[in-house]
């Protein structure tokens, strides 16, 4: 690492790598750890003999950062009067000096700092050359902490490095938000009444594990497989019910054997979904929070059309007659037809058992700003190209499909999204030039937010996958610890604090290694 010499040049003085800065907590603001004065100097002196020749403090300063010695002229620090090194020049006593550094050797007039030597090497290069960049081998947030310690503003960073730092700060803010949500959820869970030792509490724990955690055991896996099977059956039944022959019978108010079988299948599926919804409601700890869940709202929207159809039917089936599924929608008109089409929402129930669908929902929630920017870009481009293609086609005398500017909006949408149905095609050369510009602009506009959305999707998928692996590892650990207690196996909240800490340590040892983030 190049270092300043006594005559203002750069030369290496000593290369010993000391200890780095302590780790900061991931979701807390950076805090400076108080050091024990006097220990760092003695620790360095034990390593090797350093050049103890005193320096002239009026012209230069001798500092030792992590075992590396630097000799800097005071004139190098004139541009940064608020930096930590510049403040050392104003100190008049040993007490004032140790407030700014970790230790001070009065014999050699050497200042000691227990900080990262690699980061300070970059700062030294910045003081000498005026260019400040991030270290590739160091976390951007750790480097930000080093800059704050030495009193160097982040605005001096190069533009590309500053953008990288801002992205890291946004990721940290998102992690802090998720952490707060997890803490609030855990607080809500700990507020429930302590009834675990009762038989009712044990039954609720078993039921909760079965309906919410398919990996908890054989009952949970069977319950999840049945739920997926009924969802697939409902989707197939809905598709078959739209066949032309069945639609003709429905329009005529008739019901054949096929229609009867479809109605029976639909009834069985709705009965299962209703039972599953009731079980989830019974085991829910917070009933109000249960009805606010997105998947629970989808369940209500998917199940209710069947019961609404039964309630509004004016001709209920009599005893001995075959109930007709189509007769329930015959006299309710378009509203019930739309409600019946909502049965396709059953497919969204697969999100309870699909990690990919859960990742998709989490990505949509995290990328609301990116989706908003995408819609904004499309709206601006559509507003720009629609009048242009309308004017180009109108002036050429070939106005066929482009009857107005609002009618041209549809053409701009399908062109910029590269769909191109072909129902509206510009015929003139100016119109075709506008179409070419619209298509190229659409490709660029769609590509800008897509990169960020893809990055968020990959990050969310790895995050959910890691949480699932940790949960499975914890369940395996609890099952292998022997007959601790049935209550502890069913509900982790009643486990002792010592056992929970052991579980966390086992997860760290068993799970795949993750990169350590220095803050």
UniProtKB/Swiss-Prot annotation:
Q: How does it sit in the membrane?
A: Multi-pass membrane protein
- Name the domain of life: Eukaryota
A matching Pfam family: BTB_2
Give the GO terms filed under biological process for this record: action potential; potassium ion transmembrane transport; protein homooligomerization; regulation of potassium ion transmembrane transport; regulation of potassium ion transport
Keywords recorded for this protein, A-Z: Cell membrane, Ion channel, Ion transport, Membrane, Potassium, Potassium channel, Potassium transport, Transmembrane, Transmembrane helix, Transport, Voltage-gated channel
Similarity comment? Belongs to the potassium channel family. G (TC 1.A.1.2) subfamily. Kv6.4/KCNG4 sub-subfamily.
Q: From the record, which residues define motif Selectivity filter?
A: 418-423
Protein localization = Cell membrane
Tissues and organs where the protein is expressed, per its UniProt entry: Highly expressed in brain, and at lower levels in liver, small intestine and colon.
- Species this protein is from: Homo sapiens
PANTHER family associated with the record: POTASSIUM VOLTAGE-GATED CHANNEL SUBFAMILY G MEMBER 4, VOLTAGE-GATED POTASSIUM CHANNEL
The residues on the Cytoplasmic side of the membrane are 1-218, 284-294, 354-368, 462-519
Q: Which residues form a coiled coil?
A: none
Protein name according to UniProt: Voltage-gated potassium channel regulatory subunit KCNG4
Its subunit composition reads: Heterotetramer with KCNB1. Does not form homomultimer.
Function of the protein = Regulatory subunit of the voltage-gated potassium (Kv) channel which, when coassembled with KCNB1, modulates the kinetics parameters of the heterotetrameric channel namely the time course of activation, deactivation and inactivation and on the voltage-dependence of activation. Potassium channel subunit that does not form functional channels by itself. Reduces the deactivation rate. Modulates the threshold for activation by shifting by approximately 20 mV in hyperpolarizing direction.
Q: Which Gene3D superfamilies match?
A: 1.10.287.70, Potassium Channel Kv1.1, Chain A, Voltage-gated potassium channels. Chain C
Q: What residue intervals traverse the membrane?
A: 219-240, 262-283, 295-314, 329-353, 369-390, 433-461
Residue ranges for the region (Disordered) are 1-25
- One Gene Ontology cellular component annotation? membrane
Extracellular-side positions:
241-261, 315-328, 391-405, 426-432
Provide the intramembrane stretches.
406-417, 418-425
- Domain commentary: The transmembrane segment S4 functions as a voltage-sensor and is characterized by a series of positively charged amino acids at every third position. Channel opening and closing is effected by a conformation change that affects the position and orientation of the voltage-sensor paddle formed by S3 and S4 within the membrane. A transmembrane electric field that is positive inside would push the positively charged S4 segment outwards, thereby opening the pore, while a field that is negative inside would pull the S4 segment inwards and close the pore.
A GO molecular function term, named singly, is: voltage-gated potassium channel activity
């Amino acid at each position: 690492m190049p270092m300043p010499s006594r005559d203002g040049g750069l030369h290496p003085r000593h290369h010993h790598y000391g200890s780095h800065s302590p780790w900061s907590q991931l979701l807390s603001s950076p805090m400076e750890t108080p050091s024990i004065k006097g220990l760092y100097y003695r620790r360095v002196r034990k390593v090797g003999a350093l050049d103890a020749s005193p320096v002239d403090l009026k012209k230069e300063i001798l500092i030792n950062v992590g075992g590396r010695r630097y000799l800097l002229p005071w004139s190098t620090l004139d541009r940064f009067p608020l930096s930590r090194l510049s403040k050392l020049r104003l100190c008049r006593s040993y007490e004032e000096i140790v407030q700014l550094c970790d230790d001070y050797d009065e014999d050699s007039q050497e200042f000691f700092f227990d900080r990262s030597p690699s980061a300070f090497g970059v700062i030294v290069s910045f003081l000498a050359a005026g260019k400040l960049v991030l270290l590739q081998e160091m976390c951007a947030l750790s480097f930000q902490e080093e800059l704050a310690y030495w009193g160097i503003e982040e605005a001096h960073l190069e533009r590309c490095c500053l953008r990288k730092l801002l992205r890291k700060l946004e990721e940290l803010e998102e992690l802090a938000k998720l952490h707060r949500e997890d803490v609030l959820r855990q607080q809500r869970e700990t507020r429930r009444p302590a009834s675990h030792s009762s038989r009712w509490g044990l039954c609720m724990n078993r039921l909760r594990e079965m309906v919410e955690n398919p990996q908890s055991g054989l009952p949970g896996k069977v319950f999840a497989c049945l739920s997926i099977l009924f969802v697939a059956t409902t989707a197939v039944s809905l598709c078959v019910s739209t066949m032309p022959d069945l639609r003709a019978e429905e329009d005529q108010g008739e019901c054949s054997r096929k229609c009867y079988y479809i109605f029976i299948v639909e009834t069985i599926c709705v009965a299962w979904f209703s039972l599953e919804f009731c079980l989830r409601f019974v085991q829910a700890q917070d009933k109000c929070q249960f009805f606010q869940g997105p998947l629970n709202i989808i369940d209500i929207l998917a199940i209710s059309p069947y019961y609404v159809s039964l309630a509004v039917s004016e001709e209920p089936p009599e005893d001995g007659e075959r109930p007709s599924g189509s007769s329930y929608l015959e006299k309710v008109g378009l509203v019930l037809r739309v409600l019946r089409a909502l049965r396709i929402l059953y497919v969204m129930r697969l999100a309870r058992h699909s990690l990919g669908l859960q990742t998709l929902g989490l990505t949509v929630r995290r990328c609301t700003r990116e989706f908003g920017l995408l819609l904004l870009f499309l709206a601006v481009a559509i507003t720009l190209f629609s009048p242009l293609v309308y004017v180009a086609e109108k002036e050429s005398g070939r106005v066929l499909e482009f009857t107005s500017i609002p009618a041209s909006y549809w053409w701009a949408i399908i062109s910029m999204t590269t769909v191109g149905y072909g129902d509206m095609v510009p015929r003139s050369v100016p119109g075709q030039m506008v179409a070419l510009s619209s298509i190229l602009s659409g490709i660029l506009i769609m590509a800008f937010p897509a990169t960020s959305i893809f990055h968020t999707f990959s990050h969310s998928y790895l995050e959910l996958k890691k949480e699932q692996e940790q949960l499975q590892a914890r369940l395996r650990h609890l099952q292998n610890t022997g007959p601790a207690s049935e209550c502890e196996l069913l509900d982790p909240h009643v486990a002792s604090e010592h056992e929970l800490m052991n579980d966390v340590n086992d997860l760290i040892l068993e799970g795949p290694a993750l990169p350590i983030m220095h803050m």
